[in-house]
Structures are given as C-alpha cells and as structure tokens.
Amino acid sequence: MNYLNENIDSLNKKLASGDLSADKLAKDTVANIKDTDKKLNAWITVVDDAKPAENLDFSKSKLAGIPIAIKDNIITNGIKTTAASHMLYNYMPMYDATVISKLKKAGATFVGKTNMDEFAMGSSTEHSYYGVTHNPWNLDKVPGGSSGGSAAAVAGGQVVAALGSDTGGSIRQPAAFNGIFGIKPTYGRVSRWGLIAFGSSLDQIGVMTKRVKDSAEVLNVIAGGDEHDSTVSTREVPDFTKFIGQDVKGLRVAVPKEYMEAVSGEMREVIQKQIDALKDAGAIINEVSLPHTKYVVPDYYIIASSEASSNLQRYDGIRYGYRAEDTKSLLDVYVKSRSEGFGAEVKRRIMLGSFALSAGSYDRFFRQAAKVRTLICNDFDKIFAENDVIVGPTTTEPAFDIGSEISDPIKMYNNDILTISANLAGIPAASVPAGLVDGMPVGLQVMAKRFDEGNVFKTADFIERTNKFYEKTPTGMED
C-alpha cells in the first residue's frame, strides 16, 4: 500500500465502504515499508504482524484502522523503544505513552517505530545508532531531525500520519525538508507522559502528515488532559478540523523582518509568494520585529542541554540502560556504560549542560538564559496583542547533503534558529510546504498564541489549498 496519493479521509471512505479491509491495509502497509525502506532507512522497528483492533467503527473514528508511525522516543507497550540509542538498544516497554493509549482507543494501527537523532538531539537524523535516514526528495540529502524518520515515512508514502516530538524544531524542520505538514502544539496541549525526556520545559509531542486536515484529525485524538502529566492543560480541546477550509479575510498576519532576512533570495521569493497569497485573500500583513532572535540559539542550547544532562543522569548502567562489560568497580560501570552507550552528540550536550549547571557557572549561564527566555516570550506576547499569526520561513535553507554539516556542531545548531523560539515561548507552531528551491522542498512556518492551534490550522490549510504542494511526488521515490 503506497500512500503518496492517499489521506485519512480517502482511506476512511474505503474502509467504511468495505472496498478495503483494515487487516489488508495493515499487511500492505508493512509490505510497502519493507520494500521502500531499502531506500530511506526511515524505520528502526517494523511490526511484521501488525494487526488492527477488533470491532472498529469507521463512522465514529476517522483513525479506525489507519496505520500510524511512531517516533522511537515515544513509549509503546510490547514494541521496542530505543530513542535511536545504543543505551536503550533492547528496551521493551511494559506500558503505553498516553498518546498511544488515546490512539489505540481511536482504533489506530501501529506498524512500527521511526528513526531519529539519538535521544532527539540533532537536526539531520545522522546521530542515530541505526544509521542515517535519507530524504525522499533526494536520497543524498538529510531528512532533517530529530524526527527525520517520521517525516521521511510520510513524505515517502509509507504512512499517512506519524507522531514526532519537537524540542527546538524537531517536527517543523524535517517537515519543511520533506515537503509535508508538521505541527508542534502548545506546550501542555498534549501529554508528555511516556515521551523519553530531553528538555522537559521544551518537549512536545506533535503530528506529521502530508495534508493539513490529517494532522487536525490526529491532534483531535491525542490532545487533552492526563492525570499522569501535571504540565498538561485540562482546558477543552476544540475540533481542529473545523478550522479547515476557513476564509483568511481579515486575518492579521505578522512577518518578522529577522526571519525574512535570514534566508536566501530564491528562498525568500518562495516564502514571499505565500505571504502575497494571504494578502490577496484579504489577510492583513504587518511587518514586525522579534529583536531577541539573535539570542535564541545560545539561549536554547544552554537551557535544553542543562535539562538533558539532568534527564539523562538515570542512564548509568545500574538504574537504566546499557551496562558495559569487563568493569572493575562501580565507577567503572558508570563511566564505561555511559561512554559506550551514548553517541558523540548526546555526550557533547550532557557536558555542555553539566557545565552550565555547575556551581561556578549556574549564575553566569543558566540563570541568564532563563532571563533571556522571558524576554523572548515577551516579544511574542507583544506581537500577538495585535496579530493573529506569525509567518515566515521554517528554515534558513533546504535540506543539505548527508555528511556535510555533521562535523560542525555550531553550523548544525544554527539550523534551528527560526524554530527554537516557539519552544522557548511554548506557543503552537507548524510548517506547511511553500514550494521548491533547487528541487528541494522549503516550508512556511506558522505560529500563534498559546492554545490557538486553530489559527495555525486555518492559515496552513489556506496555503495548502493555494499551492497544492501535496500533488507533487518526491523525486527520490520515482522508479
């Protein structure tokens, strides 16, 4: 089953009419993954005997019988979950993350776990114990990260929907690189219980699909309160599909000058074309400034790395994770297990975070980063007082060549400069395909105030209906 020309609505109609059985859909999906993943390496684990739930009601749930991919840092009962790390190479969970429980209740079928940067730390899916994932548009390019496997699986037609996680752009950047839609909801909109922690004040589970409406369908299911997660909001979740097909006339759209200045001329033209389409449809375009944009990368990497160093303390060979052999002392167990279990990028961030939290550095680094984070939040509050959404490029460039940036951590970190702010501020943000530059997709980022995913969906859906990018086929998947 190839999903390049399918969506949740089309599959639901076939399942409801009896033209397609959920069992056949699951089997065909697994067969197609095994065939096409020779090119992509988008998966860490494929469930060979994936079976749909029994007594599915296709009229009550659009997700009934729909195969969904899950990023490998989201806990799945009975399906290996590794976070793409040697540290967890044989971890078999005994419970489900809350989002998985909700999807099961909706009747979704789980066909496997997708590749990612180890512990979600990276922007290219090159930092994986299971090898690099390839971009379906050009197999020599990265798919972005850290949710690169989920993005490639959707763009490559292996599934119609996938879950990812976003700590600094890990859904939106790969969505842009692969020409699909990806949304990071408001921090607290979706439960993080069962998400392997990276940066606890930044992490958020989200959705990646080819069509905007499909993400709305999935978010309808996974959003909402959870007694296991004290940071998740209990406010009522609207039907996000109601924002699909809406008029954008009168929508107040802010365009940050710092974002537009960060991209090349050709890429700027593609982004500007989408902004002009909004204007032609009656949206009100306002140029604005996010003056603290230049500080977001160092601010983020201090905060995120500090939280990561704390969260990853538990993986020591005693409490959790890989345990090294031939050790002679308890200290030897700790040192060898962590040295052998973690990859280079994870160790780099643990060291950075441990330094920022150390007694001599806490006030100079972490405390100052927290203050700058407040300034960044204030910038957004000021803009949303007079605007409904913020739009601009998702990334500063299209997907880059595999191996071209992995040896330069600073260059790799700067890939996140346009996406990080939304995580620091906790606001909803999405990337929707805007067009092609040098044959590779680029995305338009849409942001809104906290818990206003509705305007994000409304704006992104308008862009999708205008440019119909979903009709394009990734060139790397052509026979």
From Swiss-Prot:
Active site as annotated: K71 (charge relay system), S146 (charge relay system), S170 (acyl-ester intermediate)
For the keyword Ligase, the answer is: yes
Query: According to its UniProt record, which reaction does this protein catalyse?
Result: L-glutamyl-tRNA(Gln) + L-glutamine + ATP + H2O = L-glutaminyl-tRNA(Gln) + L-glutamate + ADP + phosphate + H(+)
Q: Does the keyword Membrane apply?
A: no
Supply the PROSITE patterns for this chain.
AMIDASES
Q: InterPro entries recorded for this chain?
A: Amidase (IPR000120), Amidase_CS (IPR020556), Amidase_dom (IPR023631), AS_sf (IPR036928), GatA (IPR004412)
The record's Pfam families line, in alphabetical order, gives: Amidase
Q: What does the record list as GO biological process?
A: translation
SUPFAM superfamilies, alphabetically? Amidase signature (AS) enzymes (SSF75304)
Q: Describe the task this protein carries out.
A: Allows the formation of correctly charged Gln-tRNA(Gln) through the transamidation of misacylated Glu-tRNA(Gln) in organisms which lack glutaminyl-tRNA synthetase. The reaction takes place in the presence of glutamine and ATP through an activated gamma-phospho-Glu-tRNA(Gln).
Family assignment?
A: Belongs to the amidase family. GatA subfamily.
Protein name, as recorded: Glutamyl-tRNA(Gln) amidotransferase subunit A
Question: Which species does the entry assign this protein to?
Answer: Lactobacillus helveticus (strain DPC 4571)
> What broad taxonomic lineage does this protein's source fall under?
Bacteria, Bacillati, Bacillota, Bacilli, Lactobacillales
